[in-house]
Swiss-Prot record:
HAMAP family: AcpS (MF_00101). It holds the Pfam family ACPS. The keyword Cytoplasm applies. InterPro entries: 4-PPantetheinyl_Trfase_dom, 4-PPantetheinyl_Trfase_dom_sf, ACPS, Ppantetheine-prot_Trfase_dom. This is Holo-[acyl-carrier-protein] synthase. One of its GO terms (biological process) is fatty acid biosynthetic process. Its cofactor is Mg(2+). Belongs to the P-Pant transferase superfamily. AcpS family. Keywords: Cytoplasm, Fatty acid biosynthesis, Fatty acid metabolism, Lipid biosynthesis, Lipid metabolism, Magnesium, Metal-binding, Transferase. Its main location: cytoplasm.
Amino acid sequence: MIVGHGIDLQEIEAITKAYERNQRFAERVLTEQELLLFKGISNPKRQMSFLTGRWAAKEAYSKALGTGIGKVNFHDIEILSDDKGAPLITKEPFNGKSFVSISHSGNYAQASVILEEEK
């Protein structure tokens, strides 16, 4: 049974500006594993797209939980990739199944998270 659904849309340029003001912004949003992936991306635009996608996914996750960021921290949620490259939530505070989708189009990243109670 679905117990939560969250969606977030984020402008890549806004996250890029936040990162340019303070590069520690990435450390605030990303876990150690996510940060390794981020630093391994050589193309700056692709790097910002990755960071924005993870931001949007974590915001969507917090909305699906019904708490928003604050009650749950960015580092409480980790999104890596499965063997096919699709995003996969690998660390989370929810005790059930979780599903995430991240899309990029133009100057935007969008994410959707569904939380499902296990029977």
